[in-house]
Amino acid sequence: MPEASSPFPDGIVLGFDVGTRRIGVAVGSAWGAGARAVAVIDVHGVAVDWNALDRVKRNWLPVGLVVGDPLTLEGHDQPIRKQAHAFACQLRERYRLPVVLVDERSSSVEAASRFAGARAAGYKRRRDADTLDAIAAAVILERWLADPMQATSLP
C-alpha cells in the first residue's frame, strides 16, 4: 500500500515499459502487491499510438502512472532514457495524473524469466513473445507497489 507521502491516492495504477518500437502496459492497484500485463502499444518512430493508450486509460481509470526509468546496470544513462522521460512528461500533460519514474534495471531479464516459466508450464506460447514488454511493465509496477518511496518524481 502506498505510504501517506506517495503521490497517488488508493486506486488503479498503470505501469509502462518504454521501448523504441513498443510500450508495455500493466495494471495494478495502489493497495495491492501484484500487477498484470494488459497491453502492448506500438511506437512508430517517435510517435506513440495515443488512441490505443487513450483506450487503456478509459478502460482502467487510473489514479496514477508509473514509468520505468531505463538505466544501465551501473546506474548510468542509456539512449532510451531520454525517450522514456519525454513519454512520462507527455503522459502527465495529456492525462493530468501524477507520474513517477521507477528504476527498471533488469526488468526485461525478469520478464523474460517469467515468460519462460509460463511457456514451460504451458500457459504461454512462442507467438505470445510480444507480450514481454507488458510483462516488463508489470515487473516495474510491482517494484513501485513494493516500495513507492523509491520512485522519482518528474521535474
Swiss-Prot record:
It is an enzyme of class 3 (hydrolase). GO terms for molecular function: nuclease activity. InterPro entries: RNaseH-like_sf, YqgF, YqgF/RNaseH-like_dom, YqgF/RNaseH-like_dom_sf. It is found in: Cytoplasm. Gene3D superfamilies: YqgF/RNase H-like domain. Its EC number is 3.1.-.-. Keywords: Cytoplasm, Hydrolase, Nuclease, Ribosome biogenesis. CDD domains: YqgF (cd16964). Could be a nuclease involved in processing of the 5'-end of pre-16S rRNA. Belongs to the YqgF nuclease family. This is Putative pre-16S rRNA nuclease. The lineage of its organism: Bacteria, Pseudomonadati, Pseudomonadota, Gammaproteobacteria, Lysobacterales.
